[in-house]
């Protein structure tokens, strides 16, 4: 499985992880990148800090950052590039997904062929 973080995304995620990790010591702590049902196009991305992987997680390493991807999200995240933009009008993670057949105008949600769940309107 290939999931790539740009330098900016890796730096931002490592910063989050370090600020979260000061109180606890876990050698398996990392970032979970997942796809969940939701958003206006059916799927939405999720990034969370976790202390340990689940049994079915794929484990990826980029630099000093451990990335976990669950087996259901893996096909939808194959080939994804995650970037972090910090601009005047918008800041946050941006996903470039070759599996997306359509994306929402808000940029936070996507469809992946006929298997996408029904979306809800942007608010």
Curated annotation (Swiss-Prot):
GO terms for biological process: iron-sulfur cluster assembly; nitrogen fixation. InterPro entries: FeS_biogenesis, FeS_cluster_insertion, FeS_cluster_insertion_CS, HesB-like_dom_sf. The keyword Methyltransferase does not apply. Signal peptide: none annotated. One of its GO terms (molecular function) is iron ion binding. Pfam families: Fe-S_biosyn. Belongs to the HesB/IscA family. NCBIfam families: iron-sulfur cluster assembly accessory protein (TIGR00049). May be required for efficient nitrogen fixation. This is Protein HesB, vegetative. It comes from Trichormus variabilis (strain ATCC 29413 / PCC 7937).
